[in-house]
Amino acid sequence: MEMESTAASTRFHQPHMERKMSAMTCEIFNELRLEGKLCDVVIKVNGFEFNAHKNILCSCSSYFRALFTSGWNNTEKKVYNIPGISPDMMKLIIEYAYTRTVPITPDNVEKLLAAADQFNIMGIVRGCCEFLKSELCLDNCIGICKFTDYYYCPELRQKAYMFILHNFEEMVKVSAEFLELSVTELKDIIEKDELNVKQEDAVFEAILKWISHDPQNRKQHISVLLPKVRLALMHAEYFMNNVKMNDYVKDSEECKPVIINALKAMYDLNMNGPSNSDFTNPLTRPRLPYAILFAIGGWSGGSPTNAIEAYDARADRWVNVTCEEESPRAYHGAAYLKGYVYIIGGFDSVDYFNSVKRFDPVKKTWHQVAPMHSRRCYVSVTVLSNFIYAMGGFDGYVRLNTAERYEPETNQWTLIAPMHEQRSDASATTLYGKVYICGGFNGNECLFTAEVYNTESNQWTVIAPMRSRRSGIGVIAYGEHVYAVGGFDGANRLRSAEAYSPVANTWRTIPTMFNPRSNFGIEVVDDLLFVVGGFNGFTTTFNVECYDEKTDEWYDAHDMSIYRSALSCCVVPGLANVGEYAARRDNFTGLALRDEVKYSASTSTLPV
């Protein structure tokens, strides 16, 4: 476990540590300690002596309480030799007993945690654990996780282990610690449903990298590791060329039935479609998604709806997670920031809202937060640098060019510079530290104009116009471009889409969607751009499709359960309770996301 050593340190303060004496008393006793007055104990470590007061040491450590009060120790004893600790660490321990603060650095955190554990000083243990959480990175996550084998740090262990699972692909590329895992440790990691990999190829490649580090001693472990890969979810070409023909696999008798079972499972999936056994078979069971796409509210059946569905991209399945206590809302905005989903503005067929609600997806609770300065239906919402931006919209009387932003820490909305044009039914996103808003309706015509907001100068700048007028548009940052998708041009709902390059200040056309739509949800999940629901010119739709910029193609995804337009989508990554929003792995009847069974209109398979 290595951490970058810096001159700076974190001084941990434990305000909630149990206290036998007041802070004032501790401060007075610390002055007496430093002056060598009224000390009644000497702690001796490797020849170094530390004067102290028994009461102060007992107040923060059960170790010292037992040491000073046990029956076999003379209560009048003054000098105690303490083994198993360095003088530097004992100095920090004693200082903490008096001040309840301790400097924690990359250089001392391991020894300090060991010392705090030895003396049962939970305040320092918690401080070291918080420090190690903040230092987690691709290079040290395995080491930190293993470090917790020796000390009781359950929250740190969980954090480190989930970091490994969530960042597996990137970690494998750079971590020297990965190559030193035991076969059992590697098996335990790659068999987890929470392992965050978009394709199972990455798991197999990680196994090969691990074996290649010590091939003579590790090649026999292929028989233990291969069954933990969801082989039937691989692209067939990769499986045949890279897995079935791999020398380690071919040389292992134990792997032969695994390969046969995988081929059979792949065949069954292609010929017969999904079955109830998909999620019970370890070769076909999709991983849990790292990020959940929420589709919130909208207009359905002639009125607003409170419906919320969660999309599991790894299983290509929607899950109804509607909270019946929540009120219906349409033409609103949604944003995810710092653990919360915010629902902003909108309309319930009677009132135009300036209200904002915040949803905690872990606790599943709703709270009202500060309202906006203006009522905003058809509002455009995006997030940048810990602020939520709300722009334009319709207040029930006029289309707006005003804009404001929300800061969660202060629970306040602040007006920013107004846009150049009035825009309702526009859409916004952020890219490279700037806010982009495109299209919309100004009360007279659908717009093809677009603007960019600079937060440093608080100024809007007009950029190159889109190639089509688009109201009810979907705008999203994807890769290095701003994508403008669908909408209404004043005559028709659109299938067309285009991408803006901030560097060139130009728009280029991309392939059209399968279905025309306006007033739909748009988000990026697993490096795919999803469009969700909307209005096709005749009716609301539950249709969903996704675009891959690498293949420059659109693909069908699983339909929502509810026909709706005027919804809003947002993506929530890294949920601790992701299983509560994902398709159930223990009782599944839906369609697993597989290259072999997902087709575009041209019958091309989903991208690898």
From Swiss-Prot:
Record flagged with keyword Hydrolase: no
Stretches forming Kelch repeats: 292-339, 340-386, 388-433, 434-480, 481-527, 529-574
A cellular-component GO term for this protein: cytoplasm
Modified residues (Phosphoserine): 501
PROSITE patterns tied to this protein: BTB
Keywords recorded for this protein, A-Z: Cytoplasm, Differentiation, Kelch repeat, Phosphoprotein, Repeat, Spermatogenesis, Ubl conjugation pathway
Subcellular location: Cytoplasm
Record protein name field: Kelch-like protein 10
UniProt pathway annotation: Protein modification; protein ubiquitination
Job description of the protein: May be a substrate-specific adapter of a CUL3-based E3 ubiquitin-protein ligase complex which mediates the ubiquitination and subsequent proteasomal degradation of target proteins during spermatogenesis. Required for male fertility.
Residue stretches making up the BTB domain: 39-106
Tissue: Testis specific.
Pfam families: BACK, Beta-prop_ATRN-LZTR1, BTB, Kelch_1
Misc note: Does not seem to associate with actin.
InterPro entries according to UniProt: BACK, Beta-prop_ATRN-MKLN-like, BTB-kelch_protein, BTB/POZ_dom, Kelch-typ_b-propeller, Kelch_1, KLHL10_BTB/POZ, SKP1/BTB/POZ_sf
Phenotype caused by lack of the gene: Heterozygous males are completely infertile because of disrupted spermiogenesis characterized by asynchronous spermatid maturation, degeneration of late spermatids, sloughing of postmeiotic germ cells from the seminiferous epithelium, and marked reduction in the numbers of late spermatids.
GO biological process terms held by the UniProt record: cell morphogenesis; fertilization; homeostasis of number of cells within a tissue; male genitalia morphogenesis; male gonad development; protein ubiquitination; spermatid development
Gene3D superfamilies the record matches: 1.25.40.420, Kelch-type beta propeller, Potassium Channel Kv1.1, Chain A
SMART domains noted in UniProt: BACK, BTB, Kelch
Gene: Klhl10
Assembly: Self-associates. Interacts with CUL3; indicative for the participation in an E3 ubiquitin ligase complex.
